[in-house]
């Protein structure tokens, strides 16, 4: 019975992380049909590199680890010459991290739902281009 209780406890923690959702979305909202180069990585995974067309997006859902220490770092570069760039922590702990690349910077909206939506509420500038 003791092992069953431990199993149920660990299983519940895993399911809680799954239900709450974890993910990154990067949306290209740059002007003048500019493309957006992106590459993200964690301790265990690499996303990209890929080029996101103007108006396009890159979305990745994943499981964060049991201890809540999952981190993703991302680098974004504005096309066509990719001379403006920024590297930043794109995910920490939990939730859905919705990033929007715009001419004046990179904006973030954190969502605590199961999936991304098209809303723009609570969007704030988090990074400036270098």
From Swiss-Prot:
The keyword Transmembrane helix does not apply. Keywords: Secreted, Self-incompatibility, Signal. The keyword Secreted applies. Residues 1-21 form the signal peptide. One of its GO terms (biological process) is rejection of self pollen. InterPro entries: Self-incomp_S1 (IPR010264). One of its GO terms (cellular component) is extracellular region. It is found in: Secreted. Pfam families: Self-incomp_S1. Belongs to the plant self-incompatibility (S1) protein family. PANTHER family: PTHR31232, S-PROTEIN HOMOLOG-RELATED. This is S-protein homolog 32. It comes from Arabidopsis thaliana. The lineage of its organism: Eukaryota, Viridiplantae, Streptophyta, Embryophyta, Tracheophyta.
